[in-house]
């Protein structure tokens, strides 16, 4: 989605957000018995999937990078502290749903004149996951300018821990881009980490 769409009016942006979230809710209504890859999901628990496939290997590799001076020790410590909080949260009643897994604003197409949604693209990383894992990309780059994340939350039942978990997923994913040869955007990483710190503070106040 071109940044020029930021200049569309409020009504157009909200209609766009409503259409995007309607599409997301449709594929989130497709469920499965287990979490994991589309072709071979093997995990009974979302936390088990995330810890084994993402959290543990990512943190181990980031620690190695940090020891070699290629990843900030301060950023690593933030992720370690956030991980401890994440792992101590109840998993709640999560169920495996179909997610896009990379639905940031650049993977959404719209008509240049009307901002009418025309397509979702690049669903190459789709998996069976907790629906919350599809939400952090909605806030990536300038997604918040369209209210995508808040629109989703207003149209679906969410957990009291959603904001923290989504912030955690975002910071972990951004840090892990170093391990995949992906493009590192320091601005987005700093914004994600700042949001994570705020959500950690809120969560600690609840506990």
Task: Label the predicted regions.
Residues 12-16, 95, 162:
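Conserved acidic
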Residues 28-39, 64-68, 90-95, 158:
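Surface-exposed helix-capping loop/turn segments at secondary-structure junctions
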Residues 40-88:
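Active-site catalytic-loop/activation-segment of kinase and kinase-like phosphoryl-transfer enzymes
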Residues 125, 136-207:
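Helix-rich C-terminal or lid/interface subdomains of diverse kinases
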Residues 1-41:
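ATP-binding pocket architecture of kinase catalytic cores
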Residues 27, 80-135:
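Active-site acidic catalytic loop and adjacent metal/ATP-binding pocket
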Residues 1-10, 32, 59-64, 172-187:
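A glycine-centered beta->alpha junction motif in the catalytic cores
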Residues 19, 78, 144:
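Charged catalytic carboxylate motif
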